[in-house]
């Protein structure tokens, strides 16, 4: 007896799936380049926590283990005063910027920042145990300091970067949850904002949710969320706006090995050990991280980088005239100690009560860019593709797509504000909404910082040397040669002398 196959038959989708194409297919690059640079960018604050007075932050938290996310605002090239107006037709083309080079400058000396907690949950030294400690008291917290994992990172894209961390998830229905049970974990992907903490060696997690004792990690992260860049998610972005390229260097080693005080939530199975005469000690082990040596030989910053081909489909085009540069540099994380006298008349002998100690961390940045002017021909196919990718781009260009025809008959009243008719739907707000409203970034405005004189800037001179592009307005300085009274050429005169 014949029977049909048990394999499933997969039917193709009714409409063809649109293919994502690279920006090089519809963006034409010109030979016009501009240099733009920021001013000296400085940040000063307390490295562990913000200082508040009357519920108002008077000293911000500034740590060497924070993300610095720069939102670079560029001028609209379609409203730009160009040296050559014949490069594009405003009726059928639009101009965009392409980032072709950048240099992230870092000031301040190399240094290692120390963090810690005066009440850290450290019970016993399990690396070099002098005795077997099995009965911890009610409070065994001690004062411990450490250095963190070493990280250097630079992410570049035209959209904010994404980060990942572990947070508390939701329990399934029907599960009996008791107080003290381990909560379920959930991988959360979110936008990395300026001031978010990086992974310090204790994991990318929400410590406020998953460590309720506030004593398992140092002060600067015990109530914070440490994020790690979500490279997999950004690499899978179909349009490649979040990540043109990235530079990364991480290193860490385990310096000390401790265990935690407290009740063990999950006991060791009896088949894994032979019972002894002593009570089993705590088996919740952890290590203190260390980033080891910092050296100028392994620096990612203070050097130029040229973008020839991005890893995604967006080859450096700055949609919306925005560029996001995300920086992490823990090799300059020195925490400075500031001492202030509490009285104007100090005693001859030292008294610690006459002085107040403060902690401060400072950061210094300088951003330099090379931008290339590009044109886009506004064909129907290109405009439809851009509208599918990001409709706000066409809105910024004062374009709109007509809606599809509606087969239903709509009602329109003469007197909209009349009480004799039903309440009408509110008119939608036509003001342009900031797509990044509610997110915190360090904004760098470069609208008035563009210059075509590349040879007048350090990064511009490096770009001219690397690419061989001539400056747009070279100045040739030469010495005028005096007119010769002889009619013979130099070659003729040399031959005449040899005879």
From Swiss-Prot:
Q: Which domain of life is it from?
A: Viruses
Task: Give the multimer and partner information.
Answer: Self-assembles into homopentamers. The capsid has an icosahedral symmetry and consists of 72 capsomers, with each capsomer being a pentamer of L1. Interacts with the minor capsid protein L2; this interaction is necessary for viral genome encapsidation. Interacts with protein E2; this interaction enhances E2-dependent replication and transcription activation.
| Location(s), subcellular | Virion; Host nucleus
- Species the sequence originates in: Human papillomavirus 13
**Classification via InterPro entries:** Capsid_L1_Papillomavir, Capsid_L1_sf_Papillomavir, dsDNA_vir_gr_I_capsid
Q: Does the keyword Plastid apply?
A: no
Name this protein carries in UniProt: Major capsid protein L1
Q: What family does this chain come from, according to its entry? A: Belongs to the papillomaviridae L1 protein family.
Presence of keyword Disulfide bond? yes
> One Pfam family, short name please?
Late_protein_L1
This chain's function reads:
Forms an icosahedral capsid with a T=7 symmetry and a 50 nm diameter. The capsid is composed of 72 pentamers linked to each other by disulfide bonds and associated with L2 proteins. Binds to heparan sulfate proteoglycans on cell surface of basal layer keratinocytes to provide initial virion attachment. This binding mediates a conformational change in the virus capsid that facilitates efficient infection. The virion enters the host cell via endocytosis. During virus trafficking, L1 protein dissociates from the viral DNA and the genomic DNA is released to the host nucleus.
Disordered: where is this region?
472-499
One GO biological process term: virion attachment to host cell
Coarsely, its chief localization is: virion
UniProt GO MF annotations: structural molecule activity
Q: Which GO terms describe its cellular component?
A: host cell nucleus; T=7 icosahedral viral capsid
Q: Which SUPFAM superfamilies match?
A: Group I dsDNA viruses
Q: Keywords assigned by UniProt?
A: Capsid protein, Disulfide bond, Host nucleus, Host-virus interaction, Late protein, T=7 icosahedral capsid protein, Viral attachment to host cell, Viral penetration into host cytoplasm, Virion, Virus endocytosis by host, Virus entry into host cell
């Amino acid at each position: 007896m014949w029977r049909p196959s048990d394999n499933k038959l997969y039917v193709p989708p009714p409409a063809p799936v649109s293919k994502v194409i690279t920006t090089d297919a519809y963006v034409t690059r010109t030979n016009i380049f501009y240099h733009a640079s920021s001013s000296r960018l400085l940040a000063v604050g307390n490295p562990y926590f913000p200082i508040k007075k009357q519920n108002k932050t008077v000293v911000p938290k500034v740590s060497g283990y924070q993300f610095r996310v720069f939102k670079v605002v560029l001028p609209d090239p379609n409203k730009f005063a160009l040296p050559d107006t014949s490069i594009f037709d405003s009726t059928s083309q639009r101009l965009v910027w392409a980032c072709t080079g950048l240099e992230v400058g870092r000031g301040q000396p190399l240094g290692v920042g120390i963090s810690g907690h005066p009440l850290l949950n450290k019970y016993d030294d399990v690396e070099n145990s002098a005795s077997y400690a099995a009965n911890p008291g009610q409070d065994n917290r001690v004062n411990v300091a450490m250095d963190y994992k070493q990280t250097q990172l630079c992410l570049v894209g035209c959209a904010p970067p994404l980060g990942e961390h572990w947070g508390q998830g939701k329990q399934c229905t029907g599960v009996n949850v008791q107080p003290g049970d381990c909560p379920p974990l959930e991988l959360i992907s979110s936008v990395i904002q300026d001031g978010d903490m990086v992974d310090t060696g204790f994991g990318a997690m929400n410590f406020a949710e998953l460590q309720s004792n506030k004593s398992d990690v140092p002060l600067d992260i015990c109530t914070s969320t440490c994020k790690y860049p979500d490279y997999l998610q950004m690499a899978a972005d179909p349009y490649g706006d979040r990540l043109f390229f990235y530079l990364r260097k991480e290193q860490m080693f385990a310096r000390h090995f401790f265990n935690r005080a407290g009740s063990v939530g999950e006991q060791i199975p009896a088949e894994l050990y032979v019972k002894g005469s002593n009570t089993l000690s705590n088996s919740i082990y952890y290590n203190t991280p260390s980033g080891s040596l910092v050296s100028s030989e392994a620096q990612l910053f203070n050097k130029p980088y040229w973008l020839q081909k991005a890893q995604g489909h967006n080859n450096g085009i700055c949609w919306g005239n925005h560029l996001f540069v995300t920086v992490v540099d823990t090799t300059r994380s020195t925490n400075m100690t500031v001492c202030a006298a509490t009285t104007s008349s100090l005693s001859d002998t030292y008294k610690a009560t006459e002085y107040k100690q403060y902690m401060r961390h400072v950061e210094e940045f300088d951003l330099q860019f090379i931008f290339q002017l590009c044109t886009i021909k506004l064909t129907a196919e290109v405009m439809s593709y851009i509208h599918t990718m990001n409709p706000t781009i066409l809105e910024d260009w004062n374009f709109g797509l007509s809606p599809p025809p509606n087969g239903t008959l709509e009602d329109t009243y003469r007197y909209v504000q009349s009480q004799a008719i039903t309440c009408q739907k509110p008119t939608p707000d036509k003001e342009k909404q900031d797509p990044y409203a509610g997110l915190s970034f360090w904004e760098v405005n470069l609208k008035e910082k563009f210059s075509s004189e590349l040879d007048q800037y350090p990064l511009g001179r490096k770009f001219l040397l690397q690419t061989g592009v001539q400056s747009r307005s070279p100045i040739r300085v030469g010495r005028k040669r005096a007119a010769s009274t002889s009619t013979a050429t130099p070659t003729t005169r040399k031959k005449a002398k040899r005879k």
